[in-house]
Amino acid sequence: MAQMSKYNQSIILKWAYVTLLLSLQVLLTSCAVARERPLQEPHTSAVQGLLDLTALPKGEITKLDGEWAFYWNHLYTPGELMTARPRAYVSVPSAWNAYTLGEEKLASYGSATYELQVLVPNDGRVWALDVPVVFTAYRIWVNQVEAASSGTVGQSAQSAVPAKYPQVVYLPGTGQTSLHIVIQVSNYENYRGGLWQSIQLGDATSITVSQQFRIIGEAFLIGVMGIMAFYHFGIYILRRKEPAPLYFGGYCLLIALRSAMVGDVLIMRIYPGLSWEALIRSEYFCVIGSLWFFNSFLYRLYPQDGSRRFKSLLTWVCSAFGLFIMAGSIQLVTEALLFLQLFILFTALYMCAVFIRAVSRRREGALAAVAGAMVLGAAIMNDVLYLRGLVHTGNFTTLGLFVFIFAQSYLLSSGFAKAFSSSEELAGKLIHLNASLEEKVRQRTRALEQVNKANVIHRRFIGRNVILA
C-alpha cells in the first residue's frame, strides 16, 4: 500500500510539472501571436479607421479592434473632426504609451481622440457597445450624438476627473448603415492610458445578455469567496489555538473585495461615488494583504517545509508596500505595479517550492494544494502578461483563485475531519477502556469476595478444630 501511494504521488508530481510547462508554453505562444498579428481575423479588423461589418450575423458580438484614427493631445468633437486630419492610425486595443508617432514615443499621461467608422447591416437591429474600463476618463459620440461618458475628460490633470466604470452603451435609432464612433480619452493618473481593452459591438439583446452573464459569474465567485471567509472566521472563533483558519479567512475576504474592484467593477454599482484613486489604492492593498495572509496560512500548514526567514521578510516587504500604496502619489503607485507583479511572481515561486517539498515529503493534503496552486499560478502569469499588454486573453485570476481556494478549503476541511475522526477514535477507545476497567473492577471485586468467603470458611474451620481439641 505504501509503495502504491508513493507511485501515485510520483505520477501526480510528473503531471503537475507537465501541466505547468504546458501553461507556460501556451502563455508564451499567446504572447508571440499577440505581437505578430491582431486579435481578430483580417476581414473583421479595422483598416485605416474603417471597419466593415455588413456581413455580421444576427446575435453575434464582435470586437472593434484594428486601426483607429488617432489624434494625440487633441480632444476633438465629431463636428471638429470634419476638418481635422488624423496624425496617425494606431492599433486598438493597446495603451497609447506603447505607440511611437514618427520618432516620438508617447508618454503615459495625456489626452487623445479616437475615431472609427463602422459599416453595419441595415436590418433593423438596435446596436449597443460594451465598453470596458478605459484609463482613466472618456466621452463617446456615435453618429454625432454623445452616448456615454466616464469621469471628466480634460487636457490637464487639474481639469480631468478619473473614473473606473465599464458600461453598456445603447445606441439610439434603427436602420443605420454606418456608425461613426468618436472617443475622447484622458489619463493623468495611471501608468497606462488609452483604449487598452477591446470595445465590443453587437445587437442590444446579445450585449445585454453577455454583460449579465459576466456580472452573475463575478457575483457568484465573490459570494462564494465571501462565504468561505466568514466560514473560516467562525472556525477560528470556535478554536482560537489554531490561527490557520483566520489567515485563510482573511485571504478569502481580501480576494473577494478585490474581485469586486476588477472586471465589471461591481463595487461601483453599490458605491457609485467611490473615487478612482480610492478604488485603485484599495485594489492594490487587497493584493498585498492577501499575499501576506496566504503566506502565513501556508507556513502554519507546512512549518517544516517553509522558511521562517522568508515569512519575516515577506511581512516587512508587504508592510512597506502597503504604506507606499496608502501614502504615495497615485502616479507612483500605478507605476510601481511592475515591481509588485515581479514580487508576486517571486513569492508564487517560493510557495510552489514549499508545495512541491510538502508533496515529496508526503505531507497531508499536499497533492490537492499543488493542483490548486498550478491553476492559480497559470492564471496569475496570464494576468501579468495581460496587464503588460503582451496578451489579449482577459483576467483569469479570479477564476484561478476560485479553484485554488476550494483546494485549500479541502485541505483545511480534511485536516479538521481527520482531527475529528481522531477525537472520535480516542473517545471510543476511552469508552472501551472505561468499560473494560469497570469489568476488571467487577471481576476483581468478585475475586476478593471469593477470597473473603474462603478466609471466613477457613477461620471457622480452624476455630472448630481448636474447640474440639
Language-model regions: role of each:
Residues C31-G124:
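Extended carbohydrate-recognition surfaces in non-catalytic/accessory domains of CAZymes
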Residues R85-E103, V145-Q167:
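Solvent-exposed beta-strand/loop surfaces of large extracellular or lumenal domains
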Residues V18-L27:
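Bacterial N-terminal signal peptides
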Residues S210-R239, L338-A358:
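First transmembrane helix
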Residues V118-N143, I181-I183:
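Aromatic-lined ligand-binding clefts that engage carbohydrates, nucleic acids, or primary amines
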Residues A256-L430:
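Interfacial "cap-and-anchor" motif at the non-cytosolic start of specific transmembrane alpha-helices
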